[in-house]
């Protein structure tokens, strides 16, 4: 595990909304400050864990964007962002997304049948976003080679595997206990 990622998670602020404790971290929220050293470290570790013999990297708007940008620059693999608004482009695929805190639509563009892809996102908690991405990519006829999230918080990995058959790789597993992030693995 990355020492930078681990230390930054252990010291990140926790905000309580209702009964849920949110951890506020540069990788998952873009605040308080995204240090280039942390982003470089995370993207380097991602590259070592994913299949790089792919045509495209796919992420959902918004916080996967800095990570896929760094990975794309380092690997020369182009990326696609599933957006929260439609563009009405030919072949656009809408898919419903439900997470633990929101519902909405995501829209997939730029994927062709047979494209080999890696899915990359910042955090997995409920698995709702990844299930939506996988479903959209299957509808597009993409060949999903890897699924990776930087931070695992919750039961989302199991949900994704049960609903889609895909295993989700992660860099670190955490939980929030007594107002602090605990590193589990």
From Swiss-Prot:
Lineage: Archaea, Methanobacteriati, Methanobacteriota, Methanomada group, Methanococci
Keyword Zinc-finger annotated: no
Lineage top rank: taxon: Archaea
Catalytic activity: IMP + diphosphate = hypoxanthine + 5-phospho-alpha-D-ribose 1-diphosphate; GMP + diphosphate = guanine + 5-phospho-alpha-D-ribose 1-diphosphate
Pfam families registered for this protein in UniProt: Pribosyltran
Enzyme Commission numbers on file: 2.4.2.8
GO annotation (BP), single: IMP salvage
Keyword annotations from UniProtKB, A to Z: Cytoplasm, Glycosyltransferase, Purine salvage, Transferase
TM segment ranges: none
Annotated function: Catalyzes a salvage reaction resulting in the formation of IMP that is energically less costly than de novo synthesis.
Matches recorded under InterPro entries: HGPRTase-like (IPR026597), PRibTrfase_dom (IPR000836), PRTase-like (IPR029057), Pur/Pyrimidine_PRTase (IPR050118)
Protein's recorded name: Hypoxanthine/guanine phosphoribosyltransferase
Localisation: Cytoplasm
Enzyme kind, highest EC tier: transferase
PROSITE patterns named among the record's database cross-references: PUR_PYR_PR_TRANSFER (PS00103)
Assembly with partners or alone: Homodimer.
Pathway recorded for this protein: Purine metabolism; IMP biosynthesis via salvage pathway; IMP from hypoxanthine: step 1/1
The keyword ATP-binding is assigned to this record: no
GO MF assignments: guanine phosphoribosyltransferase activity; hypoxanthine phosphoribosyltransferase activity
